[in-house]
Structure formats: structure tokens, C-alpha cells
Amino acid sequence: MKKFLKALKWLFILVFAILIFSILYIRFTRMTDKIIYQPDDGYEVFESRFNHEELFIPVEKDIRIHAVLFKPTSKPIGTIFHHLGNGMTLINSQLQYEPLINKGFQIFAYERRGFAKSEGKDVNSVILKDDAIIIFDEFLELEAVKNTDVILWGQSLGGAFALVNGAERQDKIKGIIVEGTFNSFPEIGKKFASILNLENFKWVVPLIMNNDFPAEEEIKKINKPIVIIHSISDSQVPFELGQNLFNSSNKSTTEFWKIDGKHINGMDGYEEIYVRKFMELIGK
């Protein structure tokens, strides 16, 4: 009996050690980043029916980020810096821009490293976060952008980028609009665990995921006006995560706009009000 208990004890220690090692390995090799940032086949030529300027912005040696500045036909009333959702390219994101361009906004957007026409490899979230700030700083130096009011716009994962961007450069912006954005990586990870019927293992998600975009912490640092948009029927980022993000914000400067419809599809269903939110941020 003693030998059995001793063997059981060592078996438990071995299993526990393997578990701890596995958690540390997944976390420090950033395996979850490979799940989040899926590669794509890209496309050869960017085309648009809008007036635009195509750019390739260097972020480090031999790596350039593909970006486009979409322009109205008249002098712009303001500039929107759009952080795209995880699977969005400049080909499909521009489908939302027409109402804003028609109002007189110019819109700048880029594709993350290693995705679509951007060069390099999307190694991890930290590098992508650094890229976003470099790109924003370069964007501010564009002649077409100087002396214009700037609004940050982020959708889904892009909303987390926008809030980090806004916290670090809030003196350069008039405000922020995010749609379908979660409050933290671990929280959205736990929701996907539930969807995959892995509820009993939700506890491990915060241990294996690096929370490189702690939106609920970054939003507390921002004193500029923020509009959080979230659909009550969002099947990809549950509505409650948008509520949690709002609960972490400065309520005096943040508006929570509840809509209905598909994930980050607000511009299609609520075009007039959506555009008005941008106009209000620049005092129009």
C-alpha cells in the first residue's frame, strides 16, 4: 500500500510538472499569437474607386507596411486613422468608407505586418503594437494629414490597437471610436473556450495568453472622447465584453452605443448615426 501511495504521489508530481512546463512553454513561446494572427495569401494589386494614395511605410530594415490614404474630392474636414479588424484587408475595409468620404473625411488605414500586402512576419503582439505606433507617427508627418483633426477608429481587434494608440498619443487626437472590441485577450480567450465546449479549462486561458493589449487598462488613461459601439447579437465578441470595456472607462468622456446586427457591421445598419458620431468628435 505504501509503495502504491508513493508511486501515486510521484505520478501526481510528474503530471503537475508537465502541466506547469506546458503552460510556461505556451506562454513564453507565444503560441497563442500564432492562433490569433492567421496568415493569408495576400493580393497582387490594390484597387479602389476612391481617390487614394498608396504607401509603403518602413518599420524596420527590409520590412514595409502597406497603407492607403483615401481622400475626398474636396478639402478634408478631418482625418480618420483606421485600425483594421484581424481578418480585414484594405480591399474589403474600404467598403465601409464611402459615407465618411462623402462627408469630407480622409481615411488612413494599414495592413499589419505579414498580412495582405505588408511585408515581414507577424511574430507577436508586442511587435505589432510597436508597428502601430511607428505607423501612426509616420502618418502624422504626411502633408495631407498635418493641420487636420485626427480620429482613431478601431474595429474588433483593431479597437484594442486603437485604445493602446490613443493612450500613448492622446495629445494628437480628437477622440476614438471602437466597435466590437473586447476588454482583454484572456477574456475573449475564455469566451472561445466556452464556444468550443472547454468551459472546464477556462481557468488556464489567462495563464497561457499574454495580455499585450489590455484595452480595459489602456482606456482608463484616456481623457479624450470615446465612443464604444457593440452589437447585442455579436457572435464573435460577446456584448458583455463591450460592456466590461465601458465599465473600465472614464464615464464622463465615454459613450456606450448599443446596436444590433452582425460583428462590426454597424456602418451598414446605422450609417447616418455612425457618421454623425465622427462628425461630433470634430465639432461638426
Locate predicted features.
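Alpha/beta-hydrolase fold nucleophile elbow
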Residues: 145-156
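Short beta-strand/loop motif that positions the catalytic acidic residue
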Residues: 222-223, 228-230, 234
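C-terminal catalytic histidine-bearing segment of alpha/beta-hydrolase fold enzymes
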Residues: 243-284
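Hydrolase active-site cap/lid region
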Residues: 164-218, 268
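An N-terminal hydrophobic leader/cap segment in hydrolases
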Residues: 15-58
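Membrane-embedded segments
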Residues: 60-138
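Short alpha-helix in the alpha/beta-hydrolase fold that links the catalytic acid
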Residues: 215, 224, 238-247
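Acidic catalytic loop of the alpha/beta-hydrolase fold
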Residues: 233-237, 264-265
